[in-house]
Amino acid sequence: MSKKHCSELLPNKMFRNQDSKYLIPVQKEAPPVTTLPMKASTVKSPHNCEAILRDADPPISLSSVNLSEQLRSGVFLKPKKQIKYWVDERNSNCFMLFAKNLSITWSDDVNYWTWFTEKESPNENVEAVGLKNVCWLDITGKFDTRNLTPGIVYEVVFKVKLEDPAYGWDTPVNLKLVLPNGKEKPQEKKVSLRELPRYKWVDVRVGEFVPEKSAAGEITFSMYEHAAGVWKKGLSLKGVAIRPKQ
């Protein structure tokens, strides 16, 4: 039997380094990793978004790469930026109806109300209205629930502010919410504004409801007080928010 060189007797997983007397294990080449194709993630479009954005002011492209960001920060709608639309973290539709979109008794008379500019965002202003002196307070608005996300609990909220000198608020105001098709009794309550913090916008909640596709229609909401005949001053109104309950 012929003698074999010792290197020939080494296991096939070892070799001798020419520069070293030590044996170095040979690493097997790792098999290629098979990468499974990933499914493209899809984000569900907000309810009725395409129809809503037809009234965007300025216009917005549905194919914009920044559409999601724009919807989160808010989009103004026609006419004349009287409505703001945005989408919350749950992908639910939210709306703000500014004072110009509401029916306010005597708001066009400078003896009773005064209009002023309020900053809504770094680049956008909206019109708010301040009460100078009235005894007949009547603010009403309406909204089509077809643009609200079905199955979500929504609340209707007046955005108001009191500034001194303010008077006439010892008498509570009436709040009323009427749902579509008269299926439910109107939600009504009285709220005192006297103790509201001054010089800051606060929420005055009217009521809540769950919009349904089968019962879509128009809601109406109002804040009023004209039975007591008391003169009122110091109230400012920014608008009404219709948003998922917080």
From Swiss-Prot:
Which InterPro entries does the annotation name? PP2-like, PP2-like/Lectin
Database matches in Pfam families: PP2 (PF14299)
GO MF = carbohydrate binding; proteoglycan binding
Q: In which tissues is it expressed?
A: Vascular tissues, specifically in phloem companion cell-sieve element complexes.
Protein name according to UniProt: Protein PHLOEM PROTEIN 2-LIKE A1
* Top-rank taxon: Eukaryota
Tell me one GO biological process term.
response to insect
